[in-house]
Amino acid sequence: MQVFELTRQLIDIESVTPNEREIGDHLWRLLSELAPRFGGTAERMAVEKDRDNILVHFGNPVVTLSTHMDTVPPFFPSREDETCIWGRGACDTKGIIASMIVAAEQLLENGIRNVGLLFVVGEERNSAGAHIAAQTPRGSKYIINGEPTDNKLALGSKGALRYEIVAKGRMAHSAYPELGESAIEKLLDALERIRRLPLPTDSILGKSTLNIGTIQGGRAPNVIPDSAMAEIFIRVVGDVTALRGAIEQAASPEAEAKEVLFIPAVHLGSLDGFETTVVAFTTDIPAFGNAWGQPFLIGPGSIHVAHTSEEHILKSQLIEAVEIYKRLVRILLQ
């Protein structure tokens, strides 16, 4: 298979979470054709209705190459120029899927076995596919998780801690504000206290960061608002036990902090001869746990263009990624 052609082929299949059926079917066809050529076994791993992980392994999968097949919205099709391939999922992670498949095919052609490919659904929302895969391990000792790291081996990734901050008030005519209670003012006070909280730091992963992502509330300009809500997202490092308590305390008494998501930060191993980096985004690695073996995180593309209208991937990085994945597999099989 040719990595540029396969990358564009995959980009042109819309797979915004949770609409992975078509790309799953396409990968199933590709891997079902690859498997018998080299004595492999292809499997569909049901996650939800019309949503399957796709797995192929050749012998016992000591090393598994894995990434996700879903993307964020909105879909836009592929195009290319001399240096780049553009389109939704180009770097996150259709180009990575293509690089992994091509690398695996070339390894197999050279007699390498005990390798697997695992492509999962739902990473962009809740890692549903990785959670299901973690319940049905296949004995893999190492999992190479693909995300856009500019082909550098990540030493770790920050976690995620998300809250809804909810405030309640009492409606009144805005001409007589003393007769009501403004939920928005309560929310703003709570958010200001949360913004001032010290956040955990880590010697490798750096500082935690906080984003107030959405604010909702109020009914009309001439009505004292009776409800307001904000969503905050913290890219966390280190132990978050104290931070959780501090957020709940800072929100009260005017508001309530409701935790809706937690993904822990992870530290990852390094290998001699690979450039390294640290990433602030979350991945499927915490959802896999250790079910598919020791994790490594590396892939072509820049996270800085992922999720944007300018998403693209360098052709040179796709070619480099094929060689990097082949080299990693050979090292880990030793």
Where are these regions (language model features)?
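Acidic/histidine-rich catalytic neighborhood of metal-dependent amide-processing enzymes
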Residues: 98-162, 202-203
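Short glycine-aspartate micro-motif
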Residues: 55, 64, 85, 141-145, ...
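Acidic/His- and Gly-rich active-site-bordering loop/insert found
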Residues: 1-90, 112
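Phosphate-handling active-site elements
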Residues: 81-83, 103-118, 194-203, 315-316, ...
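Metal-dependent amide/peptide-bond hydrolase catalytic core
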Residues: 15, 148, 155, 161-334
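Glycine/serine-rich anion-binding loops at beta->alpha junctions
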Residues: 73-74, 84-99, 173, 298
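Short, conserved micro-motifs enriched in small and acidic residues
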Residues: 87-98, 124, 181-184, 312-315, ...
